[in-house]
């Protein structure tokens, strides 16, 4: 299903260690042809008209007498694209973004033989908020819609996975924060995932979260719910159309306190919330060797607290940028649609082609002149740029984006 690996064979398995190698090599073409080759607002693709390794992971799972651990490297574009979306390293010292940038997953723990299993792990683990996996080999699309792309892909903390039956998983989290290496304030993030699969063709995934995730504002509380249903409605390996399935995800959340209100706000305490959905349908053909997915989603996010900061003049989530304010009272609405074609000659490889259209109500995506000042980034990240002669440089942002991508994913 969407967000889950289709692997059934593990050639690198042994008694103590199960190895994994995964690579995502991608070529993307932005129709706006940005001169600085920078893609804005995507967690899947960072560069235009170039072949790039977005993610290279080497590692696997250690398992011995109940003790367990997992390590997966984070090499390639993700090692810079993912850490810059976390503002927490801006608090204090030791450069947490550099300390963790090459780790996709890194945790250790213990497995208890309780009911159908109980795992306690500590470290960095994938969140699966927003349904889609961090590894695009496991997804039906490459460019996931906003309720996935703009929600956490990893957590740093402790998780407890309890399986009371072979159909139910309950997974509480005690974490540093909302996709953060460190804490934003003095309260840890608290959350839980409940995954229920009553039948082989039906799955429910419910994620709930509460935390204080605005750096320097200890009075503001974030609440978020992310809920999905997946349905496989057709299965016939002997027919041309061998399988059919769909997924629907709905997200609702808000921030309250510290100058914001969940709903019904005013000028002194504006409403600050997130609401969005995504829906995809996938067909498999020729005994599941060809896949075709269509779908998309939409979001509204007053306050822009879950909008990815555009990398204008090197801006990050910590620096922000005056060219795209993210503060109470600002507005952001967007929608997207994708068409994805996969060829999967074996369970270890996927050849993918995808067309994406995204639209926002304000200029956000990269236009032809890009988001990098002449001569490269200038001054501190995200600062205003003054050109020789005194003119103020402005980035080229537009309200729409159209993109083609082609990729090869390998998983062994």
Question: Could you tell me what each predicted segment is?
Answer:
Residues 45, 82, 91-96, 202-210, ...:
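Outer-membrane beta-barrel pore domains
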Residues 57-78, 83, 161-171, 228-233, ...:
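Surface-exposed extracellular loop regions of Gram-negative outer-membrane beta-barrel proteins
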């Amino acid at each position: 299903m969407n967000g889950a690996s289709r692997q059934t064979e593990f050639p690198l398995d042994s008694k103590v260690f199960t190895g994994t190698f995964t690579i995502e090599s991608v070529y993307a073409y932005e129709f706006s042809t940005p001169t600085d080759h920078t893609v804005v607002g995507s967690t899947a693709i960072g560069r235009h008209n170039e072949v790039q390794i977005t993610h290279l992971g080497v590692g696997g799972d250690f398992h011995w007498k109940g003790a367990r651990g997992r390590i997966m490297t984070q090499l390639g574009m993700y090692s810079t694209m993912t850490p810059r979306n976390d503002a927490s390293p801006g608090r204090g010292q030791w450069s947490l973004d550099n300390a963790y940038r090459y780790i996709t997953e890194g945790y250790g723990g213990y497995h208890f033989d309780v009911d159908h299993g109980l795992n306690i792990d500590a470290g960095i683990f994938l969140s699966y908020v927003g349904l889609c996996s961090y590894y695009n080999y496991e997804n039906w699309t490459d460019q996931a819609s906003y309720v996935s792309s703009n929600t956490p892909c990893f957590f740093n903390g402790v998780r407890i996975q309890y399986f009371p039956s072979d159909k139910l998983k309950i997974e509480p989290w005690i974490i540093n924060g909302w996709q953060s290496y460190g804490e934003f304030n003095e309260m840890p993030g608290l959350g839980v995932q409940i995954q229920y699969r009553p039948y082989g063709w039906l799955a429910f995934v419910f994620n709930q979260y509460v935390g204080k995730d605005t750096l320097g504002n200890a009075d503001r509380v974030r609440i978020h719910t992310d809920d999905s249903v997946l349905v496989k409605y057709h299965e016939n390996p002997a027919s041309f159309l061998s399988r059919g399935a769909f997924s629907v995800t709905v997200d609702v959340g808000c921030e309250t306190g510290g100058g914001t209100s969940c709903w019904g706000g005013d000028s002194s305490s504006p409403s600050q919330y997130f609401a969005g959905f995504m829906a995809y349908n996938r067909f498999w053909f020729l005994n599941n060797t060809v896949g075709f997915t269509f779908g998309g989603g939409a979001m509204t996010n007053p306050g822009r607290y879950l909008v990815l900061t555009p990398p204008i003049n090197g801006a990050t989530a910590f620096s922000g940028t005056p060219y795209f304010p993210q503060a109470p009272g600002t507005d952001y609405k967007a929608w997207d649609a994708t068409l994805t074609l996969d060829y999967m000659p074996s369970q270890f490889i996927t050849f993918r082609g995808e067309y994406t259209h995204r639209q926002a109500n304000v200029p956000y995506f990269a236009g032809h002149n890009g988001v990098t000042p002449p001569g490269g980034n200038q001054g501190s990240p995200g600062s205003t740029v003054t050109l020789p002669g005194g003119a103020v440089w402005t980035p080229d942002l537009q309200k729409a984006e159209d993109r083609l991508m082609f990729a090869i994913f390998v998983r062994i």
